């Protein structure tokens, strides 16, 4: 199976790449052999032109601002939406014709869609929007193409985030990687695979 992983250089994308490495994995990120800027639709188009038809696409990108609710302005919410939501939606929108019949997309959300933390309102907004999109898009994608999301908690190998997630039990990259395996190799669509 030929699998494109966008964001393979990060903790979460790296977990997906490691778990799927028995397949032909094409790693894309801001730098490297397959460079892509997911905030630029033309860059996404170039990536798909370069790699050709794929069987599955995993997207693990998106940064969001963390700040107290009173300090978040419209620009912060727009930034979160552009970086986390629109970037992943553009990959689906521009890549749907480059995914084989009965292929799949797997997007990445996060625990803040369902479990709030202080300073996390923009992240909660973006993650919730992506999860709703996955549910809706699953009913309309052509040619039997599936779409799911993986929604992990804070990762064990990202201790710099632990203080922002008090009481949250960190999850292993192995478990996160297996959620991507389930999405890519399974049969479900319109699902959010929670890892917490």
Residue ranges: model-predicted function:
Residues 98, 115, 136-145, 187:
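Active-site-adjacent segment of SDR/Rossmann-fold oxidoreductases
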């Amino acid at each position: 199976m030929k699998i494109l992983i966008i964001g393979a250089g990060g903790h979460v994308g790296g977990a997906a790449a490691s778990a799927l490495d028995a397949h032909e994995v094409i790693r894309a990120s801001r730098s490297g052999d397959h460079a892509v800027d997911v905030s630029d639709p033309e860059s996404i188009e170039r990536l798909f032109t370069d790699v050709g038809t794929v069987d599955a696409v995993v997207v693990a990108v998106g940064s969001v601002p963390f700040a107290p609710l009173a300090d978040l302005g419209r620009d912060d919410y727009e930034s979160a939406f552009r970086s986390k939501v629109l970037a992943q939606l553009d990959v689906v929108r521009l890549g749907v014709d480059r995914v084989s019949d009965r292929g799949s997309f797997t997007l990445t959300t996060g625990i803040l869609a369902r479990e709030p933390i202080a300073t996390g309102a923009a992240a909660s907004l973006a993650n919730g929007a992506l999860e709703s999109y996955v549910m809706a898009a699953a009913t309309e994608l052509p040619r039997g193409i599936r779409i799911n999301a993986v929604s992990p908690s804070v990762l064990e190998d990202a201790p710099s985030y632990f203080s922002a997630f008090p009481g949250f039990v960190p999850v292993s990259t192995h478990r996160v990687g297996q959620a991507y395996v389930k999405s890519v190799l399974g049969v479900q669509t319109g699902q959010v695979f929670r890892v917490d």
